[in-house]
């Protein structure tokens, strides 16, 4: 019932000290949650070439600021995040991971650009000649559910018959693990 939970990220103690939660971060996150709830769309661009369009109609928006005071809630520290869970099929465009960005999966800074093409929530292409793009492609290919063409592109379309529809349904569920689940951004001044 009244339990409050705080998940502490596996960060260096210096980062935790630098990213202490405060009332100002809480107010900023709550303001941005309201903005996300009131928006119909979000566009993300960058000098590196990112041009991502996210439909927000019907999206669930939330966030966290690194501490919790209400019973029955969970947060994580460091905090300071506003995010949205958009409807299926509403994320499209190009996302470029540029040198200096962090790839949390590999716990490393990106050294050479990776360009991801996203269509209806799915990464349909991973471009880049450097080690970072190679690591991303091999990581996704290692799961063995994208076929010889590389990463899973989109749920397969049934070709007819109940067996084909059942196989497509199973394949679609498996590939949904690769779809965009949420989009968000940080608001913690100490992280800048």
Regions found by a protein language model. Name each.
Residues 109, 125-192:
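Dual-mode signal for accessory low-complexity, basic/Gly-rich regions
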Residues 1-119, 134, 144, 149-163:
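Active-site bordering "gate/hinge" segments
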């Amino acid at each position: 019932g009244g339990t409050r939970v705080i998940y502490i990220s596996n960060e260096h103690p210096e980062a935790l000290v630098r990213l202490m939660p405060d009332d100002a971060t809480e107010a900023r996150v709550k303001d941005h949650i309201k903005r996300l709830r009131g928006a119909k769309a979000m566009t993300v661009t960058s000098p590196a070439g990112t041009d991502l369009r996210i439909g927000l109609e019907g999206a669930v928006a939330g966030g966290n600021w690194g501490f919790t005071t209400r019973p029955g809630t969970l947060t994580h520290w460091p905090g300071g995040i506003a995010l949205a869970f958009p409807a299926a099929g509403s994320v499209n465009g190009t996302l470029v991971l540029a040198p200096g960005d962090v790839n949390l999966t590999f716990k490393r800074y990106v050294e050479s650009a990776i360009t991801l093409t996203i269509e209806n929530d799915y990464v349909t292409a991973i471009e880049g000649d450097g080690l970072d793009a190679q690591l991303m492609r091999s990581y996704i290919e290692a799961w063995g559910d994208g076929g010889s063409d590389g990463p899973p592109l989109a749920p397969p379309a049934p070709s007819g018959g109940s067996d084909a529809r059942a196989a497509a349904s199973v394949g679609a569920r498996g590939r949904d693990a690769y779809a965009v689940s949420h989009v968000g951004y940080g608001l913690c001044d100490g992280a800048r």
